[in-house]
């Protein structure tokens, strides 16, 4: 149920009847304050100016045509021409009933699209570090939301599995296997990469062999392809452990590494030349873009093939966008890549559009994000100044949550404590990130993220268990409750009901903008409204059974909404805390 969309259409029709143009924008928004109703239509200012009349005069005319019978109990004009809409309690009650009767809580499915989501993208032969956290969990929240809404989502894990460093890595893997009698497990990927690089820098014979191996790998030699595949397998097996711990939905089947696009690169360069978009410049192949200027104010040259014949990330990203449209049949492509890559992506996509590889009707969207910073405001590092491994961060989250949970539940059985600590610890790390606007940098702070008050995972998980505890005390089953009517008489009941019915609007914003913090803010607000409702509207000690059951149903929809909302974020809920 999208009340905002329903009201927008009603107000728009009334505006047209009052003389506004057919493309007028009613600008219906959720009201910021209770005294302004549940929704406010702010579109009179802009339209009145075009019509040469006072906004309040237009608002008065709109009201004569606005039929919100059965939807609103009161509609009033405020200030210079805002229209405040107060929802009818009977309308709220009816739609709370409908939401409870639906597995999807009354959320409609929009027109189905095929949406490719590019996220996570770790590198082969390197361990995942904190720099991979934001892309992985923000991207996964977008995927979960889009899938819930009914879209066909293709997860694309754009793994860094190609490049000149693979000659060095294969040579080192070969050396290790010879010295360790055949098969070996790479327990320490970081150490493996570091040792390979050290040998490459210090041993000229090893470096020469590594350079030869690159050529053989790139020419498709089966032995070197096999060694390369082994490195990819070892890395992705380790990464899968991290994905599973993080409760993200990525699997090995979602890997679409850089190497996938290699066969396309020569054809793309040739095609861009044939179309007159790419030219030779100082031995390299370059596309000059008028949209981007260099320091001299001239069109910027973007290299797509080096003079030695090598390709660049830009070439791969052009091929990647083309593949996602032509082969995966994407209607929309979302990239969860940090903000420092913005110009690079814009240049690649400008070439993609000019070449006609992806039509303008298919959006290519860079859902960029800021950096994770330490308390000192600098990039998050270890005490020694090194990169923080993601596995180490999750270990610490689990350890801190374990202590916290044990403190509050000294008699909890060990297996239950471990399960709860995992949900709280991992949930805290994820929620702390997801609850911030992704476009900004944010400060990583253990004390804040593990607090049981404020907009945190432990608070949200606790809020959910608190609602469930009402049901345990009520000793009533869902079947008995289903037949009971919802009656809304108190203001706090109406406020909670209206907020519950705004779940679809919240999902729609997250799906459109890729902003999970909007869902976090909604759920936190919902938990606060339930808290006020619980305090001022007695549930179990209500004046009669009808009121008791009605309030239990509001509590029931709150629990279901909190659980489903947290699930779209990839945050686990627990029954007891």
Curated annotation (Swiss-Prot):
Catalytic activity from the UniProt record: tRNA(Arg) + L-arginine + ATP = L-arginyl-tRNA(Arg) + AMP + diphosphate
UniProt short sequence motif 'HIGH' region, positions renumbered to this chain: 122-132
SUPFAM superfamilies from the UniProt entry: Anticodon-binding domain of a subclass of class I aminoacyl-tRNA synthetases, Arginyl-tRNA synthetase (ArgRS), N-terminal 'additional' domain, Nucleotidylyl transferase
Annotated CDD domains: Anticodon_Ia_Arg, ArgRS_core
Cellular component annotations (GO), alphabetically ordered: cytoplasm
Tree of life domain: Bacteria
GO biological process, one term: arginyl-tRNA aminoacylation
Any one GO molecular-function label of the UniProt entry: arginine-tRNA ligase activity
Disulfide-linked positions: none
Family matches, as Pfam families: Arg_tRNA_synt_N, DALR_1, tRNA-synt_1d
Family annotation (InterPro entries): aa-tRNA-synth_I_CS (IPR001412), Arg-tRNA-ligase (IPR001278), Arg-tRNA-synth_N (IPR005148), Arg-tRNA-synth_N_sf (IPR036695), ArgRS_core (IPR035684), DALR_anticod-bd (IPR008909), Rossmann-like_a/b/a_fold (IPR014729), tRNAsynth_Ia_anticodon-bd (IPR009080)
Assembly and binders: Monomer.
Family: Belongs to the class-I aminoacyl-tRNA synthetase family.
Name of the protein in its database record: Arginine--tRNA ligase
Organism field: Escherichia coli O6:H1 (strain CFT073 / ATCC 700928 / UPEC)
Lineage of the organism: Bacteria, Pseudomonadati, Pseudomonadota, Gammaproteobacteria, Enterobacterales
């Amino acid at each position: 149920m999208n009340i905002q969309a329903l009201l927008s259409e009603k107000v728009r029709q009334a505006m047209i009847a009052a003389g506004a143009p057919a493309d007028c924008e009613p600008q219906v928004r959720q009201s910021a304050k209770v005294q302004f109703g549940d929704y406010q239509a702010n579109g009179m200012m802009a339209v009145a100016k075009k019509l040469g009349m006072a906004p309040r005069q237009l608002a008065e005319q709109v009201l004569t045509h606005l039929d919100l019978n059965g939807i609103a109990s009161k509609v009033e004009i405020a200030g210079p021409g805002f229209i405040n809409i107060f929802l009818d309690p009977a309308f709220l009650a009816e739609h709370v009933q409908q939401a409870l009767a639906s597995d999807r809580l009354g959320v409609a499915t929009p027109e189905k699209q095929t949406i490719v989501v590019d996220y996570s993208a770790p590198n082969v032969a390197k361990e995942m570090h904190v720099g991979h956290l934001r892309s992985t969990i923000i991207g996964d929240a977008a995927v979960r939301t889009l899938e819930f809404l009914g879209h066909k989502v293709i997860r694309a894990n754009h793994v860094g599995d190609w490049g000149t460093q693979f000659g060095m890595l294969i040579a080192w893997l070969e050396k290790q296997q010879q010295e360790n009698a055949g098969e070996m497990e790479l327990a320490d990927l970081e150490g493996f990469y570091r040792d390979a690089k050290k040998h490459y820098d210090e041993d000229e014979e090893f470096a020469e062999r590594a350079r030869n191996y690159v050529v053989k790998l790139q020419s498709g030699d089966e032995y070197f392809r096999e060694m390369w595949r082994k490195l990819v397998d070892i890395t992705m097996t380790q990464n899968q452990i991290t994905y599973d711990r993080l409760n993200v939905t990525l699997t090995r089947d979602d890997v679409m590494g850089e190497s996938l696009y290699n066969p396309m690169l020569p054809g793309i360069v040739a095609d861009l030349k044939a179309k007159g978009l790419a030219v030779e410049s100082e031995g390299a192949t370059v596309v000059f873009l008028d949209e981007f200027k260099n320091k001299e104010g001239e069109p910027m040259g973007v290299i797509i093939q080096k003079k030695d014949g090598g390709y660049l990330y830009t070439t791969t990203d052009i091929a990647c966008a083309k593949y996602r449209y032509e082969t995966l049949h994407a209607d929309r492509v979302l990239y969860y890549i940090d903000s420092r890559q913005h110009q690079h992506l814009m240049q690649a996509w400008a070439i993609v559009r000019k070449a006609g590889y992806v039509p303008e009707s298919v959006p290519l969207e860079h859902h960029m994000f800021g950096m994770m910073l330490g308390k000192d405001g600098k990039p998050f590092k270890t005490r020694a100044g090194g990169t923080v491994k993601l596995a180490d961060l999750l270990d610490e989250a689990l350890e801190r949550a374990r202590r916290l949970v044990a403190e509050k539940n000294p008699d909890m059985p060990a297996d239950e404590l471990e399960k709860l600590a995992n949900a709280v610890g991992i949930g805290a790390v994820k929620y702390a990130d997801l609850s911030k606007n992704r476009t900004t940098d944010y400060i990583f702070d253990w004390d804040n993220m593990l607090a049981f008050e404020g907009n945190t995972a432990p608070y949200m998980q606790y809020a959910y268990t608190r609602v469930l505890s009402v049901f345990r005390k009520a000793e009533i089953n869902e079947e008995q409750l289903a037949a009971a009517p919802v009656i809304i008489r108190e203001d706090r009941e109406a406020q909670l009901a209206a907020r519950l019915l705004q779940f679809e609007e919240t999902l729609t914003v997250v799906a459109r903008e890729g902003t999970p913090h909007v869902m976090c803010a909604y759920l936190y607000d919902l938990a606060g409204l339930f808290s006020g409702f619980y305090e001022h509207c007695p549930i179990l000690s209500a004046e009669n059974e009808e009121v008791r059951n009605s309030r239990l149903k509001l509590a029931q929809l709150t629990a279901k909404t909190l659980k489903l909302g947290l699930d779209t974020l990839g945050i686990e809920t627990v029954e007891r805390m």
